């Protein structure tokens, strides 16, 4: 899979941009605040219908304009797919695939597979469980339509249950109904996550050993509020009932995959608590390259890899690993200088220079 071309109109600082990408390595070079990350962001948006930088779509629209437009021409499964995105100032968006308008975001997710590595991804190791849940949910949603459906339905039921918990007069019968529904959707979510963690461990083992020259072993462990993972549905219903009084007091649901997490261990030591920043960054690098392999295993094609200003933060060995591992993967790289890349680029690579919302090839 690879991107053939990208068009932007009134997107961030791009008034009108149309570029063709090569199926191999594409490097966007420029000083800070020139628009390099805006290109990455627009590509990412076509995969998930959301930015990785903001939840406010109107920020994507150029100043004093009414709308922004993205067109991504993608070659996937031996077919060309054109994704069109119109973003309006009122927060609405209109998306079409091959000129057919979609009615739900779920119809887009999985059409264009993408993995991104940016400096913010260090949060996957360092910060709250919500960051790690979001990572695993995004990865699984683009691979598994059923998972995305279960996640959407689970969150709807969770919202309704929490509304009941906030009422002065608690409707116990409604809570009974919501408990069963949560457990049904929650079981599917947890089972799929557990399988993903297995795959993550399978691929990460060799990747991390290679990056660290065999000095470290990495392992991921899923941490669930549901203790009996052999009987998730019944166990979850029971725990929701047992914790109902606490949930009523706190006005929030305490059991379920929305409270789960996964831990990252380096040589059996918790990377979040005891890992150095270098070790944490290497862990994220491992996760991202394992994600590439998982997507290849499931779909038969590598996704597009987006590397947003991360090479400058990697040491020589890690940088070399990245640049020697992307030969068969379309990669979009942003950076301020090309000096460290020249020996890894060839006649099949493409270099773009970004200057204040204008791109020269």
UniProtKB/Swiss-Prot annotation:
<keyword id="KW-0963">Cytoplasm</keyword>
<dbReference type="InterPro" id="IPR003395">
    <property type="entry name" value="RecF/RecN/SMC_N"/>
</dbReference>
<dbReference type="InterPro" id="IPR027417">
    <property type="entry name" value="P-loop_NTPase"/>
</dbReference>
<dbReference type="InterPro" id="IPR001238">
    <property type="entry name" value="DNA-binding_RecF"/>
</dbReference>
<keyword id="KW-0067">ATP-binding</keyword>
<keyword id="KW-0235">DNA replication</keyword>
<keyword id="KW-0742">SOS response</keyword>
<dbReference type="InterPro" id="IPR042174">
    <property type="entry name" value="RecF_2"/>
</dbReference>
<comment type="function">
    <text>The RecF protein is involved in DNA metabolism; it is required for DNA replication and normal SOS inducibility. RecF binds preferentially to single-stranded, linear DNA. It also seems to bind ATP.</text>
</comment>
<protein>
    <recommendedName>
        <fullName>DNA replication and repair protein RecF</fullName>
    </recommendedName>
</protein>
<dbReference type="GO" id="GO:0006260">
    <property type="term" value="P:DNA replication"/>
</dbReference>
<dbReference type="GO" id="GO:0005737">
    <property type="term" value="C:cytoplasm"/>
</dbReference>
<comment type="similarity">
    <text>Belongs to the RecF family.</text>
</comment>
<dbReference type="GO" id="GO:0005524">
    <property type="term" value="F:ATP binding"/>
</dbReference>
<dbReference type="InterPro" id="IPR018078">
    <property type="entry name" value="DNA-binding_RecF_CS"/>
</dbReference>
<keyword id="KW-0227">DNA damage</keyword>
<keyword id="KW-0547">Nucleotide-binding</keyword>
<dbReference type="GO" id="GO:0000731">
    <property type="term" value="P:DNA synthesis involved in DNA repair"/>
</dbReference>
<feature type="binding site">
    <location>
        <begin position="30"/>
        <end position="37"/>
    </location>
    <ligand>
        <name>ATP</name>
    </ligand>
</feature>
<keyword id="KW-0234">DNA repair</keyword>
<dbReference type="GO" id="GO:0006302">
    <property type="term" value="P:double-strand break repair"/>
</dbReference>
<dbReference type="Pfam" id="PF02463">
    <property type="entry name" value="SMC_N"/>
</dbReference>
<dbReference type="GO" id="GO:0003697">
    <property type="term" value="F:single-stranded DNA binding"/>
</dbReference>
<keyword id="KW-0238">DNA-binding</keyword>
<dbReference type="GO" id="GO:0009432">
    <property type="term" value="P:SOS response"/>
</dbReference>
